[in-house]
Amino acid sequence: MTQYMDFEKPLAEIEGKAEELRALARANEEMDVTDEASALDAKARKMLEELYGALTPWRKCQVARHPERPHCQDYINALFTDYTPLAGDRNFADDHAILGGLARLQDRPVMVIGHEKGNDTKSRIERNFGMARPEGYRKAIRLMEMADRFNLPVVTLVDTPGAYPGKGAEERGQSEAIARSTEKCLQIGVPLVSVVIGEGGSGGAVAFATANRVAMLEHSVYSVISPEGCASILWKDAEKMREAAEALRLTAQDLKQLGVIDRIIPEPLGGAHRHKETTIASVGAALGEMIAELSAMDRAALITERRNKFLELGSKGLAA
């Protein structure tokens, strides 16, 4: 059953009524509710088009965080074959917020790395809600180095509210680990492609998304800070998150316009959480296209292009 967000309450009522009619028809075979149910379905679709055609930045944040949205493990299971998970940073521990391993994408050997939030209470706690600790970023560095050594393209799937800010993580060098992961992204001489599949939160996302090609799902978000965190700092009031979301320019559409990302992957009507298989297939197609485009480039060209891409960010605005 779909979990509805607050702005979808009118939609929930309509779809609920349609389901009630169908339940009555199933209980009584002589009852024909086809016309009534179809009318409600048409009304619900029209409302979906209106709601998702005019999503505010804050509502996009809500969609990006939807618990039923496909997560990293869903993409790995559906898109990659021969997946062999690799664990540990060879220094402290294995961070379960970060998945990674060898796999094949459309029969091409790759290294896949991503944030995993979990899909129920137990797994969310185990995955730390997708907030990686230093050992997670050091694991990612190890996997990127391995990919570079064996000339494997790297695919990163970004979905995190941010790196974990706990005391232990800070003591073990969280900021250094994020910086080293970002540095490693800039150093490897293989194609590096990244997709923001949900939340792209702060340095925790940048550490994976400093890539040759960066894509975002249509209703995902990518920002230096969460709207709630921004509101708490600027207005001393987390309830100002709507205003903060507007100011942060965190939507895929804004970031494409600003040149921060390279492409937007469309989501089906109603968001990825309503149509998981279609969304996952779209991401797979985009990944294949981006890797194929980059595979013709040699090591030096890949590194130079990636480095220049990020050094030039903001140059148009500064020049103006």
From Swiss-Prot:
Matching Pfam families: ACCA (PF03255)
Enzyme class, UniProt record, top EC level: transferase
Main location: cytoplasm
Gene3D superfamilies: 2-enoyl-CoA Hydratase, Chain A, domain 1
Catalytic activity: N(6)-carboxybiotinyl-L-lysyl-[protein] + acetyl-CoA = N(6)-biotinyl-L-lysyl-[protein] + malonyl-CoA
GO cellular component: acetyl-CoA carboxylase complex
Keyword annotations of the record: ATP-binding, Cytoplasm, Fatty acid biosynthesis, Fatty acid metabolism, Lipid biosynthesis, Lipid metabolism, Nucleotide-binding, Transferase
An individual GO BP term: fatty acid biosynthetic process
Pathway assignment: Lipid metabolism; malonyl-CoA biosynthesis; malonyl-CoA from acetyl-CoA: step 1/1
GO molecular function per UniProt: acetyl-CoA carboxylase activity; ATP binding; carboxyl- or carbamoyltransferase activity
Annotated InterPro entries: Acetyl_CoA_COase_a_su, ClpP/crotonase-like_dom_sf, COA_CT_C
Location relative to the cell: Cytoplasm
NCBIfam families per the UniProt record, alphabetical: accA, AccA_sub, PRK05724.1
Family indicated by similarity: Belongs to the AccA family.
Name of the protein described by the UniProt record: Acetyl-coenzyme A carboxylase carboxyl transferase subunit alpha
Native source species: Roseobacter denitrificans (strain ATCC 33942 / OCh 114) (Erythrobacter sp. (strain OCh 114))
Gene: accA
